[in-house]
Amino acid sequence: MTRHPEGRPSLRPDRESFASLADGDRPAVVRATFPIDVGVEPLEAYAALAGRTTEGIPDAGEYAFLLESAEKVPSSDPDGAFAPETVERHARYSFVGFDPVTVVTVEDGTGTVDVLDHRYAGLVDADGGAGDDGDAADVLDRLRGALPDAERRGFPDRDRQLLDGGLVGFLAYDAVYDLHLDEVGVDRPASRFPDAEFVLNTKTLVFDHAQGDVSLVFTPVLRPGEDARKRHDELVAAAERARDQVSRADDLAMGGFERTSETAGSKAAYEDAVRRATEHVLDGDVYQAVVSRERELRGEVDPLGFYASLRETNPSPYMYLLAHDDLTVVGASPETLVSVRGDEVVANPIAGTCPRGNGPVEDRRLAGEMLADDKERAEHTMLVDLARNDVRRVAKPGTVRVEEFMNVLKYSHVQHVESTVTGTLADDRDAFDAIGATFPAGTLSGAPKIRAMEVVDALEPTPRGVYGGGVGYVAWNGDADLAIVIRSATIETPAGDEGDRNVEPDGTDDEDRTVDRIIVRAGAGIVADSVPEREYEETERKMAGVLDALERIERDPDRSAADAPVEEAGR
């Protein structure tokens, strides 16, 4: 790796301009950028800034993230088959966040804030107050309160979505009990996971792969009367320290996976759950219910090595590595929960799955059979209608559109059918409202949503935890981008005798656990003519990409050190 540490880059804006931007009678979030020109790659930067090196930033590794995104482009299929239905995705951005200033956790209806930078005490309120309808605050009200009410200054106008600070984290599927199921009398099960956990991030390393630029973006909040020149000096020092960190990062020496045990649940039990879900459909309770199952693996795993393996073998529109103290979320999700850019709301329902073939010809044959399957088409159309209804809840009347319908997207082990639903956000709504309107995705619950969630609660033996929720961000400007947590794994590290992560699914203590617990989960949409064995096989295919990435670093840990770019998902 080529390094060019010499020279002294400058923080923009300069000291006096920064102070001028910060001047005012209200808290202000002021944007400043620092160019990073040392030839660093995203994985290397994450490793350095998350404290993996001996000279890492103190405590930064407890909360850090790596998010990588991709854009749609026209298909490059040389044969033109299914064009324009077949599309691929290519990388645009990578984001590395480190050293957050607060952590907000919502659990059992209570929001707590861990203030990591004393200057943010009092700026964040996870109590949430009352919701818009006067009811007690829910998880989204609490997250809204975790984003300080501050004027944005120094932010450029731009025509695309970009994370340059704000709230980053996950909203677990189990938040449905707070948002929906408590109202219909469904008891919340015991869970090892919070409903939500987000960091307030003010330091983001932004990689623009299309432009070849790497910048460290600061978005600190300054109070009225605060010494802005002193804060600027601190940012310069922090920028130079971070630049020095990444410039001295050695080639990655990532670990692998040493498995000690694995449990997958009973195939017969899952197929019985499918039959019971089918009975609900035939009885008219639901049109569809998404029933999931999990695999639990135990052993010692390096999350960064795992992510690198998944990134290379299963590149996807949403790649993420979230390190939250003793819980890490690693994933390669193909599906948007909701995206908000300015006043545009976007949902991308994915429904319809078939395996990849042995080559382009078989890929096209299998995709054609999927598109011609009446069951797949009916299921997809139903979920597109559900997405339209979700978006309509927060959109201006008459603005909801289906922009793309039944595109085929290719991934490492499967092909999916995707559509795009858009709407214009109503003037009195924000990103948190949009998240609430679309959460959980109908593709992870079924339809109608509330009754389908009740069926899922009755049929699945363990709480879903993070699976089926959302992972992503709400930026300072109100933009948001959250992926559905699928094709993902949670890694729970031993937390000691008092650690919450040492609690088993049945609520018993697991104080002797000294290895990581890795949970991989997948589901299938159950309708009237579902065949239990086929639905089980679909969950196996959906888990395959994540399990293969683990097995790859188990067989050969050194292979995970390859820092391959996020290439097109259809390769």
PLM features: residue spans?
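Extended alpha-helical targeting/anchoring segments
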Residues: 2-571
